[in-house]
């Protein structure tokens, strides 16, 4: 059975761009007769807030997106909150250490910026140059006596990792194009997203991942972890991002396009989901449409591959429920 997931980060209220990705993930699972899991990715204690988690669940339900397992209703694979799963991440990190696949990195952020040199294009930043990759036990001990606390990095395996994305087709990358050896745990003990999401998806039996195209470039990193852990990765479908009228990616700073703000402004939920259905090519024109009425209509044949720009008058259009 297909097991898809919605995996919001409770670091703010969800916005129209989040709703776009979540609706497509929900539809992909529902029209395949599958289950939908909700997982709160609150792995970063400096940014995540419980009140945002509650608000996100309320907003998703208001939009008409439900789930079969999650933080509020439980399920066989819980807990469905990353901050309560850190022991699992520690255990898997120990497994990787036993395999010789990780090593301590004592580089400070300032040193990493210096090592990076010129600005590096792409979401993953400059490749890690391997400064700490082959430190001896004595060198590690000396750095720890200096008061340095190590992060833990993956020793990138040889070769490339390939996958067939549901929208963007065949992809492959490895080594420096993936940022080189990447951190699995920060020096302050916080586990990295890449490790947490793979451990969780394996434990929860996730077979289908639908998410924004901004995460396309980090997929080979996750495939490297799947390979080392001997687990089957899910099928991936990356969808284009929504941009504002100036061409910038929608983010949590766009408060006027938060689902909560749209709701408070009197925009009906079906207007929002109908607009998103039109963008996905599920319906020819913008009309109110609930997610449940779109089941069976999602197709990669009609999904755009380029980022989608929302017009400057998007709020007025959403209120009216029409593209005119």
From Swiss-Prot:
Its cofactor is Zn(2+). L-glutamate binds at residues 5-9, 41, 193, 211. Binds 1 zinc ion per subunit. Zn(2+) binds at residues 105, 107, 128, 132. A motif ('KMSKS' region) lies at residues 249-253. The keyword Signal does not apply. GO terms for molecular function: ATP binding; glutamate-tRNA ligase activity; zinc ion binding. SUPFAM superfamilies: Nucleotidylyl transferase (SSF52374). The keyword Zinc applies. It comes from the Bacteria. GO terms for biological process: glutamyl-tRNA aminoacylation; tRNA modification. InterPro entries: aa-tRNA-synth_I_CS, Glu-Q_tRNA(Asp)_Synthase, Glu/Gln-tRNA-synth, Glu/Gln-tRNA-synth_Ib_cat-dom, GluQ/Sye, Rossmann-like_a/b/a_fold. Keywords: Aminoacyl-tRNA synthetase, ATP-binding, Ligase, Metal-binding, Nucleotide-binding, Zinc. Belongs to the class-I aminoacyl-tRNA synthetase family. GluQ subfamily. Catalyzes the tRNA-independent activation of glutamate in presence of ATP and the subsequent transfer of glutamate onto a tRNA(Asp). Glutamate is transferred on the 2-amino-5-(4,5-dihydroxy-2-cyclopenten-1-yl) moiety of the queuosine in the wobble position of the QUC anticodon. This is Glutamyl-Q tRNA(Asp) synthetase.
């Amino acid at each position: 059975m297909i097991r898809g997931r919605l995996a919001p980060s409770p670091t703010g209220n969800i916005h129209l761009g989040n709703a776009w990705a979540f609706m497509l993930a929900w539809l992909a699972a529902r029209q395949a007769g599958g289950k939908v899991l909700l997982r709160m990715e609150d792995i970063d204690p400096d940014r995540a807030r419980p009140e945002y988690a509650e608000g996100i669940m309320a907003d998703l339900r208001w939009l008409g997106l439900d789930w079969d397992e999650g933080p509020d209703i439980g399920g066989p694979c819980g807990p469905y909150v990353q901050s309560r799963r850190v022991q699992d991440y520690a255990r898997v990190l120990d497994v990787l250490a036993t395999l010789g696949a990780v090593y301590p990195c004592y580089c400070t952020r300032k040193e990493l910026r210096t090592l990076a040199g010129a600005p590096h294009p792409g979401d993953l930043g400059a490749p890690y140059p391997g400064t700490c990759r082959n430190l001896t036990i004595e060198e590690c001990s000396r750095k720890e006596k200096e008061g340095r606390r190590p992060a833990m990095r993956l020793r990138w395996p040889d070769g490339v990792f390939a996958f067939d994305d549901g929208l963007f087709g065949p992809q492959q990358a490895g080594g420096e194009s993936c940022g080189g050896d990447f951190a699995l745990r920060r020096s302050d003990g916080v586990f990295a997203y890449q490790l947490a999401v793979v451990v969780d998806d394996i434990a929860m039996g996730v077979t289908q991942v639908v998410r924004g195209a901004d995460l396309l470039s980090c997929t080979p990193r996750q495939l490297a972890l799947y390979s080392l852990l001997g687990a089957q990765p899910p099928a991936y479908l990356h969808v284009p991002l929504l941009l504002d009228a100036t061409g910038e990616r929608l983010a949590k700073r766009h408060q006027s396009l938060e689902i909560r703000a749209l709701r408070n402004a009197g925009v009906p939920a079906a207007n929002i989901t109908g607009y998103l259905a039109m963008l996905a090519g599920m319906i020819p024109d913008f009309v109110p449409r609930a997610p449940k009425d779109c089941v069976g209509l999602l197709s990669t044949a009609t999904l755009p591959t380029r980022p989608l720009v929302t017009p400057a008058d998007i709020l007025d259009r959403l209120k009216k429920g029409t593209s005119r």
